[in-house]
Amino acid sequence: MKCLEGLHLQQRPSKFSVSLAPEEGLVCAFQLEEEKENEDECVCSDQAPEVKEEGCGLGDPAIVSAFQNTQVPQQRGLHSSHRVKVSGALGMSSASLHFMWQSVFPRASSPAHHFGPQQPSPDPFLFYSPLTPWPPKLSLPSHLTQLHPQHQQILQQQQRWRRRRSPTARSVPAQKPWSREPAASDAYANLMTRKEKDWVIRVQMVQLQSENPRLDDYYYQKYYQKLEKRQADKELLGQKTRAESLKLVTPYIQKPEVYESVVRIEGSLGQVAVSTCFSPRRAIDAVSHGTQEQDTGAASSQRLRVLSQIEKMFLQLLKIEEGQNDGLPQLYHTREQSSQVEKLFQALKTQEQNNLEEAADNLLQVLSVRKGKVLVARLLPFLPPDQAVSLLLYITYHLPLLIQRDMADQGLHMLFKPLGKYISHLTFHQLLHAMQGLMLLSPGSSERPVSVVLQNQFGISLLYALLSHGEQLVSLDPSLRSSSDCATWTDLVILIAWEIAQLPAASLAEPLAFPRNLLPCSAITWTSN
């Protein structure tokens, strides 16, 4: 498209005339697609459409204001021609020139075409200022640099027709006309069939399968639990309806049982030879036989057996604790948990021993190890009240021996809170029987076991809690005051108070908790003595 050179707009003397210098010619962005390629000569029209005075000579008020403000005062009225003359070659076809004249200077008889909402006429002073030197630089309005709607429609129809005829147009998606970037194509598309993709996905899902998801996929399980809790809270508040959240469901594939043909001997450093068809060997030959020297050291290996038993019981306890967080139904959870707790209690349950020096007792061996104390403390909340009370009585009866074995570990204090919850379940007869065991004199000793209890923090705390519970039973049940058990209880309290008075104040341990109802009773007992 060439420049417009020497465009002169002339009208009657009452109107205006504008002269544009060739070097300041305007560039037109319009070019028709149907313009002939072999048209080299410029076509110039000497006679332009007549601009009538009535009926708004220029189509756009903005153009009228621009031309009126840019006219030189001395040039007004110099040209009296009634037509607009164009000097110089325009360098465009007659059809293009004719369309440009129609768009800039529409006839009065034809209405002005406006596309889009009507815009107010701009201020003429925006285009020209008196202080601006001549000639000013003009720019055509936006509707002169765009295609005519009819021509743009023809161009779009031709583009659609070309896409239909091209064989590759159907596979390539149509590109938007305003998109400058070419359509992106995936070089790796359609390399795998849908069946192959499903097979790869199935293999990946099998790798995610786990028999213990809480251990293998802990963070995802916790995330999903928080997500379900958040949705449940929103449902309670009425913010949203109940909707199933997306959860990863892996296919279940039963794993075959692994059979180990290797004979393993506990304590051996190497691997025992495997029986094969080339070197047959009976499994009984691989079993180790104990010697007389090993039998003499059975006492030293007894601790190892106790530690092994504690480890096995601890693994069962961990399964019980994990069962509470699995989200299983309450009925199934209670039935399964009660059976596992019963197995653990049967492993700890022993017959009550009157001999305090009985070292072979199973529960005493477990409580002699720090991890065994942790095991019993974590097992107590799962036990029924009757089983927990039996453990409480057993620990109270053997309390002096347990304190002597706890000098190095100092771990008995972790049993105080779990045992303190079941002290209220003791009857008066059970309490009296447990307290009498602390006052028995050991053979060949003049010191009562209660003196050892008073010098230990766990022992004195448990003793004060038992005395407080006994005082509550006596005060709440008037029938006990007239019975023989009440007299025995009074003598027992006096003996304990006497032992406390005999010990120096520095030897008494500081209790973990001091009952409120024990101070008045101690004061009355001390006054009566």
Swiss-Prot record:
Main location: cytoplasm
MF terms in GO: G-quadruplex RNA binding; poly(G) binding; poly(U) RNA binding; RNA binding; translation repressor activity
UniProt keywords, alphabetically: Cytoplasm, Nucleus, RNA-binding
InterPro entries: Pat1-like, PAT1_dom
The protein's assembly and partners: Interacts with LSM1.
Family: Belongs to the PAT1 family.
Role played: RNA-binding protein that acts as a translational repressor.
Protein name: Protein PAT1 homolog 2
Source species of the chain: Mus musculus
Gene this chain is encoded by: Patl2
